[in-house]
Amino acid sequence: MGAVVAFAMSIDPTCAQSPSFAIYQDKADCQFCHGPDGDGRGDPRSPGKAPDLHKTALTREQLIEVIACGRPATEMPHFDKYAYEDKSCYGLSAAEVGKNMPPDPHSTPLTRREIEAVADYILAAFVGK
């Protein structure tokens, strides 16, 4: 089974059949806000509110942290179900974030591997393109 997962994760992440694409588009529903093309024009009620992923300067590690932890005081949800239980998110606890806590995801939380796959998809499909 591990070999199947390793093979699936090695598929070009920009391919519509890749697990990374499926997580971005469907499971995490990133496209709802960021758009299917990552341009920040997803939600028709708030066009352009989400960042254009083509223009991000975030590193892979920073993308992983943003996906896992969300963005305090914004609508960017956290996808790690344990976010803010300790200080692994921006060095902050839930008590320190308080009312600025990022919302829960619209979908189910993601595993660490799925969060990494979304970051890899964003880097391969959008950043600098």
What are these regions (language model features)?
Residues 86-129:
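C-terminal capping alpha-helices of c-type cytochrome domains
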Residues 34, 68, 122-126:
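Protein kinase-like catalytic domain
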Residues 1-18, 127-129:
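N-terminal export/targeting leaders of redox proteins
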Residues 35-97:
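Gly/Gly-Pro-rich "capping" loops immediately C-terminal to redox-active cysteine motifs
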Residues 17-37:
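Sequence/structural segment immediately N-terminal to covalent heme-attachment motifs in c-type
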